[in-house]
């Protein structure tokens, strides 16, 4: 029984292989063959239709409408982007805040604007202080030690109220007196030196012995 089944399977496989070989070895119908010429003669319209160009859409209204809408949307997006950039780049000045405060209606907006105005005032003061500090540091770095010391002394004098006119005159008088006293001291020292240098007779101290 198994042998019969095996023989049937082998037989069917051989038939299938032969059929495939026939198909592969079969010649293709050439254009110049009788069958090809007969088919062309029977169906001339098919050849004409195959040679015709492909039909194209002539109605372009839909495409134009879409492109116009797209361009309009892009233009609006560009304009809104520029407006947002300009709003972000603008700084709120004191005058602009005051005008907005005057035109504000609700109390909440008024309170917010008052806070913003106070903040801008403080910020302006801080900016001015930082600018002056930066200039002072640059000048001190460029200048020498003598000029920096002089500027520090002037600033300290200005902070302490400055030197009074009487103090200045007293200091000038003391300086003049010191200048006058210096040559007198030198003269007295010179006289002392001359006195010390004069020779003294040591035998003059002894008593005179008179012979009688």
Curated annotation (Swiss-Prot):
GO terms for biological process: ribosomal large subunit export from nucleus. It is found in: Nucleus, Nucleolus; Nucleus; Cytoplasm. Residues 191-201 have a biased composition (Polar residues). PANTHER family: SHUTTLING PRE-60S FACTOR ECM1 (PTHR28280:SF1). Belongs to the ECM1 family. Associates with the pre-60S ribosomal particle and the nucleopore complex. This is Shuttling pre-60S factor ECM1. It comes from Saccharomyces cerevisiae (strain ATCC 204508 / S288c) (Baker's yeast).
């Amino acid at each position: 029984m198994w042998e019969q089944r095996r023989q049937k399977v082998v037989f069917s496989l051989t038939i299938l292989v032969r059929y495939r070989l026939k198909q592969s070895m079969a010649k293709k119908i050439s254009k110049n063959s009788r069958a090809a010429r007969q088919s062309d003669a029977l169906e001339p319209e098919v050849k004409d239709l195959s040679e015709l160009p492909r039909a194209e859409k002539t109605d372009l209204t839909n495409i134009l409408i879409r492109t116009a809408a797209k361009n309009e949307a892009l233009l609006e997006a560009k304009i809104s982007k520029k407006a947002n950039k300009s709003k972000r780049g603008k700084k709120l000045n004191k005058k602009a805040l005051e005008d907005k405060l005057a035109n504000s209606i609700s109390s909440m907006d008024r309170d917010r604007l008052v806070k913003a105005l106070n903040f801008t005032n403080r910020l302006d003061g801080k900016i001015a202080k930082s600018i002056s500090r930066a200039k002072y540091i640059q000048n001190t770095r460029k200048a020498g030690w003598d000029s920096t010391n002089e500027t520090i002394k002037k600033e300290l004098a200005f902070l302490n109220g400055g030197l009074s006119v009487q103090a200045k005159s007293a200091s000038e008088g003391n300086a003049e007196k010191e200048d006058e006293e210096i040559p007198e001291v030198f003269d007295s020292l010179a006289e002392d030196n001359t006195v010390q240098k004069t020779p003294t007779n040591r035998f003059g101290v002894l008593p005179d012995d008179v012979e009688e």
